[in-house]
Amino acid sequence: MASSEEVVAPSNEEEVTETPAAQKREERLRKFRELHFKRNEARKLNHQEVVEEDKRLKLPSNWEAKKARLEYELLVDQKKKECAERGEDYDRVKLLEISAEDAERWERKKKKRNPDPGFSGYAEAQLRQYQRLTKQIKPDMENYEKQKEECGEDFHPTSNSLIYGTHVPSKDSINRMVDDVEKQIEKRAKYSRRRAYNDDADIDYINERNAKFNKKAERFYGKYTAEIKQNLERGTAV
């Protein structure tokens, strides 16, 4: 009886063999949980990236450049207001902040980007006026952000959007447009007078149309024909 009631205690060897197995199982479970967590995180990040890419694709192709230009113009307007409050000239303050080389490089870049070829036709003159007027338009970033919040995802319309044609300009915008148009009319009235005739100028034309043609030809080819004209005047032309 005594031998049957004896409880057999586990040996130390069995404990030693079970403990590493449990540790390995726990290690595998821990790695599995880490992989599961990383997979969920990767899924979330991929979804966020897909959403952001879809938003970027819906934006205009030159949106980043426009945004940078608007931010720069907004910063320039703020500096101009600060200079006006201090009674300073913004152009002079700006020149004091940059070196002579940068100013010269900026001036060359400005002339290269917007050269003045002179009058070559009414269509070209009208196009240059349009470009000059559109560059003078100042963005209203406060109203822009307000409309962006109100419209949400429809702020950048697609083929399925119904937001087109629903915008109503404010009274301030209409007043600015009226003031700008009046300034254009006033400026146009000053330059619409017929130029006075110069009696001392050389007559190398037969009528007014031919005079305009000669001026245009001189503007484009004058530097190439200057030497020939001088030789003809001196009588040394071959």
Swiss-Prot record:
Tagged with keyword Coiled coil: yes
Pfam families named among the record's database cross-references: SYF2
Keywords, comma-separated and alphabetical: Coiled coil, mRNA processing, mRNA splicing, Nucleus, Spliceosome
Ranges in coiled-coil conformation: 64-85
GO biological process per UniProt: mRNA splicing, via spliceosome
Region entry Disordered, spans: 1-25
Coiled coil found in the keyword field: yes
A GO CC term assigned to this protein in UniProt: U2-type catalytic step 2 spliceosome
Subcellular location: Nucleus
Subunit-level organization: Identified in the spliceosome C complex.
Function: Involved in pre-mRNA splicing as component of the spliceosome.
Family: Belongs to the SYF2 family.
Protein name in UniProt: Pre-mRNA-splicing factor syf2
Organism of provenance: Danio rerio
